[in-house]
């Protein structure tokens, strides 16, 4: 099945960024807005990607 690229709910700070029609989210407490996306894994936690497109390509 297709895994969605999502933000981890417990780390979130939103910045004014929008890539490919999707909102980017950012890790709290990292200083500035370094974007990341996660691709959830059932058994291994999550893979992290710096752009929505990279995440999308890996998840689908």
Swiss-Prot record:
Q: Which UniProt keywords apply?
A: Disulfide bond, Protease inhibitor, Serine protease inhibitor
| CDD domains associated with the record | Kunitz_TAP-like
Q: Where is the BPTI/Kunitz inhibitor domain?
A: 5-59
Q: Name one GO molecular function term.
A: serine-type endopeptidase inhibitor activity
Alphabetical list of Gene3D superfamilies matching this protein: Pancreatic trypsin inhibitor Kunitz domain
Q: Which residues pair up as cystines?
A: 5-59, 15-39, 33-55
Key word Iron-sulfur present: no
List, alphabetically, the InterPro entries matched.
Kunitz_BPTI_sf (IPR036880)
The protein's role, per its UniProt record: TAP is a slow, tight-binding inhibitor of blood coagulation, specific for factor Xa.
| Additional remark text | The inhibition of factor Xa seems to be reversible and stoichiometric.
Name of the molecule in the record: Tick anticoagulant peptide
């Amino acid at each position: 099945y297709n895994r969605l690229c999502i933000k981890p709910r417990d780390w979130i700070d939103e910045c004014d960024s929008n890539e490919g029609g999707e909102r980017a989210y950012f890790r709290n407490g990292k200083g500035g807005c370094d974007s990341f996306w996660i691709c959830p894994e059932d058994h291994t936690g999550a893979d992290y990607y710096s752009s929505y497109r990279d995440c999308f390509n890996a998840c689908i």
